Structure formats: C-alpha cells, structure tokens
Amino acid sequence: MTFYDHTAIEPKWQAFWADNHTFKTGTDASKPKFYALDMFPYPSGAGLHVGHPEGYTATDILSRFKRAQGHNVLHPMGWDAFGLPAEQYAMDTGNDPAEFTAENIANFKRQINALGFSYDWDREVNTTDPNYYKWTQWIFTKLYEKGLAYEAEVPVNWVEELGTAIANEEVLPDGTSERGGYPVVRKPMRQWMLKITAYAERLLEDLEEVDWPESIKDMQRNWIGKSTGANVTFKVKDTDKDFTVFTTRPDTLFGATYAVLAPEHALVDAITTADQAEAVADYKRQASLKSDLARTDLAKEKTGVWTGSYAINPVNGNEMPVWIADYVLASYGTGAIMAVPAHDERDWEFAKQFNLDIIPVLEGGNVEEAAFTEDGLHINSGFLDGLDKASAIAKMVEWLEAEGVGNEKVTYRLRDWLFSRQRYWGEPIPIIHWEDGTSTAVPESELPLVLPVTKDIRPSGTGESPLANVTDWLEVTREDGVKGRRETNTMPQWAGSSWYYLRYIDPHNTEKLADEELLKQWLPVDIYVGGAEHAVLHLLYARFWHKVLYDLGVVPTKEPFQKLFNQGMILGTSYRDSRGALVATDKVEKRDGSFFHLETGEELEQAPAKMSKSLKNVVNPDDVVEQYGADTLRVYEMFMGPLDASIAWSEEGLEGSRKFLDRVYRLVTTKEIVAENSGALDKVYNETVKAVTEQVDQMKFNTAIAQLMVFVNAANKEDKLFSDYAKGFVQLIAPFAPHLGEELWQALTASGESISYVPWPSYDESKLVENDVEIVVQIKGKVKAKLVVAKDLSREELQEVALANEKVQAEIAGKDIIKVIAVPNKLVNIVIK
C-alpha cells in the first residue's frame, strides 16, 4: 500500500518556500488586500505546545485561500519578547535575559517553520529590538505630549517577590499575582499612568463598528462600565467639610441612612474624632494589606469603623453616620458612597451588622428580612412619592441641580492604565527628571533610548528598577549644566503588543513608525485570531493606542481589527479519581478499554483538562510532526470540531487524519488520471468546490474537511479520475495540507512552480442540480440535527458528514460512541455512552 513520506516531502517544500520567498507579501496595487494576523507569542523556554498551531493553522488556511483568490496577503509573525518570565528565569539561573530570549525565539521559529505556515519572514518583528522599541518609545512621547501619560502617587498592587507593582488586571480573585501566585499588598508609589479613561466613550461606541464575538464585546463593555446617574454633595456636620458621592439611583436619596468612605479617602483623617482615631488608624492599616479584588468580594464578611462624624442628607436634613469600610475603593467613583440599606444587599448586610437604620423608599418586599432590590413606586420620599423609577430619577436630578447640591453625571468603571514596572527587562521610559523639578521627554532624534546591558538585574527592593544601579546610563547633564536622572521604571509587556500589527506593515522604516500610504493600503486587520483570555487587556490597550494614533493622523482607521476570532482550547487527556482529583497520565494504565490508577488500582474516569506539566499531558508538536507529519497535525486540529470549541486531544483522531492524507496521496498518485470527463464525479466535485470555498471563508474548517473526505470516497469508487477534477481537488486540500498539496500538484503538472498562486477553482452551478435529500441525525433516538446531503451517499459518507456537523459535535463531545447506524437517504442514528 502506498503511503506518503512526510519526512522527505515536508522539509523539501519548506526549503523550496524559503529559497523562493514564496510568501513574500504581494504589492500589486490593483489587487484586493487581505491582512491575516495571529496574536504573536511570548517566546517561552518551553517552546510551542499543540495549542499554538490551532489558531496559526486557521489564519494560514485563510491566507493560502486568499492568495489563490488573487489577493495581496499580509501574513506576518513576530515575538512579544519583553516581560517578567525571561527576567525571572535570568535571575534564577544567572543568564542574560537577552540571550535566553534569542535562544527561545530561534526554537519557536524552528517549530513554526516545521508546521508549514506561510509567513512572510521579511516582516518579522521583535519587541526587544531597539529598532522596534524606538517606535514604542516614540508613541509614549506622543502620549506624554498630549497629557495622556502622567505621573501620579497611587496605591499600587505591590508584589514583594516580583519586586514590582502590577496592574489590577494582573491580580487574581484570591488576591495573589497572576504570575507566580505571590501575595499582593497595596502601597502608595510614584507611577506612570496612561489616561485611557479619556477614550472611554469612544472605546465603548466603536465596538459597534467591528465584527467581534458578542461575548468579547460584552466583556469590554463591562470593563469600561458606563453608568449614568448623579453626583450628590454631603456636608459633614459641624465642619466646613463636604464630600461627593456618585449614585446611579439618586431617586433613593430619602433612604440614605449612612455614608461610607474608602479608608484612603482624603477626608478620613480630617473628620475622624479623637475617640475613634485609634480604631480608624488600625482599620486603615489592615485595609492596605488587601487587594482591590479581595476587598470587593461580595462573599466576604462586612467590616468597617465609624469615624465619629455625621453627614447631613441634603434632601431631608437627617444626620447620617460616616463610616469607613474596605469594600469602598478610593480608585473607584469618588471613593465615597451613600448607603441605602433597604434596597442594596451589601448596604443591608452592613446595616444589620452594625445596627444602622434601614428606611424603605420603594414599595414592595420586607426590608426587615432582606433588601428589596426590584423596582417599585416610591414611598417615604416626599416629593417623589408615587413616582416610578425613571420619573423619580429625573425629578431628583432636577431638584439636586436647582438646590446646588448635585448634578447629572456619567461615570466609567474603567481606571487609568498603570503603565510602569520596577523591572529591568522592558522598554526604558524615555523621560528625564531634572534637578530643577522639571521633566522632559527624550527627543525623537535620541530614540531609541537603549536598555543598558547590566549583570545586576535583581529588583532594587526600594521601588526603583535595577536601572537605578546603572549610574553611567542613569545620570545626564543638560547643555546648561543642569543635572538629571533618567526614568528608571520600564514599560509593561503590554506596550510592545499594543501596536505590533502596525509595524508589520512597514517593518524596516527608519524614519517613521510606518509609511502613511502603506497603512492606508493594509488597515484595518481583516482577521485577528487568538485566545479569548486577551479579551479585555491586550485588545482594549491596542484599541486605545490605535485611537490616539488616529487622532495624531498616523493611522487612517478608527479601529485596528475588523474581525476577531477566538479559537477554543485544546485540552489534554487526563483522568479523575472518585473524589474528582486529577491523576497524572504516568500514574494510569489501560486495561480492557478502562483506566486504572497504577498505585491504588482504582478505576478512573477519563476527563479532558487543560494541558499542564504536572498532569504530564502536554503534547509537543515536534513529536507529532516527527511521527505523523505537519500536514496531519494541521488537518487533525482543524477537523477536531468547530474552531471556537474546546476539545480534547486524541491520538486516535490524529491517526485518522493521517490515514485520510494517505488516501488522498494514493488517490492522486495511483489512480489513472485522464483528460476526458466521464461526468460521474460532476456533482460531487462541484459540490465540494462550492462547500469548501464557502466554509473556508466562514472558518468552518471541520465541515470543509468532511466535504473533502466525501469527494475522496466518491473518486475512489471510479476507475479513472478526470485531470481537471484531480487538480481542482489538490488545490482545495492544499491550504490544509500544504506540503502534500505542493507534492501532488507537481505529480499532476510538473510545473516546477508553487501551487500557492494558482487561481482557486470555480464550480459550475448547473452541475449541482441533481436531487439533494434531507436526512435526520438522531442521538439516543432523539433528533438532534437535520442535514441536506447529496442523494445516495454511502453509509460511510453519511456517517462522516453527520459526525462533522457542529450540533452533533456538541452533543457527542467527551462521550464514547458505541455505534453509528446510517441509513442512506434517510437517517443517521448515533449510540453514545
């Protein structure tokens, strides 16, 4: 039996593509453009895992498809190479992070090339290259000039073990750091901030302009957190002090019975009475040790301390005790709230705990038992009595403004972006602080401000970065003799990744970030593929920088990424015991189709879980490529199920994909190829061209592969294969299995040219008219899908089409298929356990 030799074929075509610059980006201005972007990887020491190629294969299929359709295609790759892991590794091992990073990049590049991706390597970028970060620094200077980068003394999330402050987004719900799982404490420090809040409304509005998953848009909307309400000013009794609260429910002001300030609020010390001073100071100290997430956890016990002072409720003159409590954050809103315990669960719990008044102002519920949080007509509310919510809000805002004690207000949950890191391995911030108290940006002519090479990269522990120790770099003197110090903080890893897609467009430009005409030609990115874990941070930061650059006239579009697609996660094979605990794969043996714990003998349940070193279920793509070939890995990952689904890795599935490619190879190399068309394959061939074209365009790669299988089955039943159909079929499969595609194209044409730019096959509508039939797919006897398929499909073909269907895939995910009963032209019944 004939098999294709991937160990010979794949390196041969990889060398051909490299030698011939096959995937150099097209520049023919008469052609349409297609910009396919992958989220570039952080080059870790571990190398690629099989999750990386899933998204990369998807963009590669699209890129190859669009080239064949006559587009100029920009399909680049680069490295997000600054950041904590390399620095941490360097400190642990004594290695230079630059050397470690360069080795990792070389390994990643080797692995990526072995998978046959059609990247234009002339456009490779590396965020740690001074020629790249010159422009990261240039963008920072523009932010600084526009007042969007500023210094502030802010309470930060300090991680002693990392020697740096981290952003709110990098703190886990349990109050530890995302990287390393270390304790996080709050401490005030001088930090660089970026004023992303100035763009809050545009970041919200322009989500309507892009084709993104609604779930991702919702995550960004929630993060931006727009609220419409009112600011209300409360005077502190017997003082000249006052404070402002923002509330979305000014209509409930008659029910406000106490106020709560954040422990860090500027007013706290001024209004705390002598007999409460010690308790307040003690409480402030405890609050400083908690992260924002820990403080605002709804499930935690309510704590607080009375300041000894009272505020005056402006609408009824009632006295309201002023408390401090850690669930109110100084960084959120005004750092103060009016508490309406009758209609807010957290306020109600607090009021019950500390025996504070609870006055209902909305009809309904029993506020002695629980807070009433639904809507009702107003009661106990003077001039608002009997009004509904909308009318009462409008009337109260009118009253507040007339009395001069409040006004209508729109607020956002979004906070400014904490931009500085007290670490070595990042872009230096191009600012000089002079001894006369002024600060200036490093002029463009002196950029890049290069990160100095130093042996001592341990955190200083003082809150400054290790750059504070490099005195010959640190200290500068102006022409007028004034001395200065360079900024020692560095930028976060998010900086370089906020604009890299722009540099790919013109990566070697030494005069500007990128040429305007090229930016006009290529923007926006047509498809951006990456993990949903970047839904908020990276995507929000990149959109923010893009909008700033749009305002500066640098980029021609309001949004960077027109379409976003999140691939699912590839889960590892893993096992659970009766307690639900995961068991490492090296502790498991298979007997008679079941799985047992090697040490205890307990029978285990197979349960897919995220691949991890501890479970010993990480699959290295190098091993798969060596055993099965890159084309098999690509086809398998695209055929596993819908691209956005999370699916378990399966060795059997891999073997199935390899067998399919062997059948393809045999079909084209051993079948008699003839110049005359018998017509026997007219319908299935034209159906296949139509289906694959439409499904690739919609990124439904699994159903496209299922249709290719249908064609192979049909063609194998014929003695001869019409040469045009053989060529067309090879073109259809080439984006999925490019090495095999090239090899078979040469077998059919001997052209010596790559298949990459051969025009995509078209189909003949008139050949599709033969009757289709609707079949039903049943699982456990219940109809789960109805499919329209070609009449007279064999049992095997019917089974393949049914099992590739998205609805069916969802139903059978993670379950054992006992048998499949296919009745041609009628139904498919799937029996699962």
From Swiss-Prot:
Entry-linked CDD domains: Anticodon_Ia_Leu_BEm (cd07958), LeuRS_core (cd00812)
GO BP annotations, alphabetical order: leucyl-tRNA aminoacylation
Substrates-to-products reaction catalysed: tRNA(Leu) + L-leucine + ATP = L-leucyl-tRNA(Leu) + AMP + diphosphate
Source organism superkingdom: Bacteria
Keywords carried by this UniProt record: Aminoacyl-tRNA synthetase, ATP-binding, Cytoplasm, Ligase, Nucleotide-binding, Protein biosynthesis
Sequence motif 'HIGH' region, location on chain: 41-52
Positions occupied by motif 'KMSKS' region: 610-614
EC number: 6.1.1.4
Protein's cellular compartments: Cytoplasm
Major location category of this protein: cytoplasm
Signal peptide: none
MF (Gene Ontology): aminoacyl-tRNA deacylase activity; ATP binding; leucine-tRNA ligase activity
Pfam families: Anticodon_1 (PF08264), tRNA-synt_1 (PF00133), tRNA-synt_1_2 (PF13603), tRNA-synt_1g (PF09334)
A GO cellular component entry from the record: cytosol
Keyword Ion transport (UniProt): no
Binding-site residues, ATP: 613
InterPro entries reported in the protein's UniProt record: aa-tRNA-synth_I_CS, aa-tRNA-synth_Ia, Leu-tRNA-ligase, Leu_tRNA-synth_edit, M/V/L/I-tRNA-synth_anticd-bd, Methionyl/Leucyl_tRNA_Synth, Rossmann-like_a/b/a_fold, tRNAsynth_Ia_anticodon-bd
Keyword Signal: no
HAMAP family with a match to the protein in the record: Leu_tRNA_synth_B
Family: Belongs to the class-I aminoacyl-tRNA synthetase family.
Name of the featured protein: Leucine--tRNA ligase
UniProt lineage: Bacteria, Bacillati, Bacillota, Bacilli, Lactobacillales
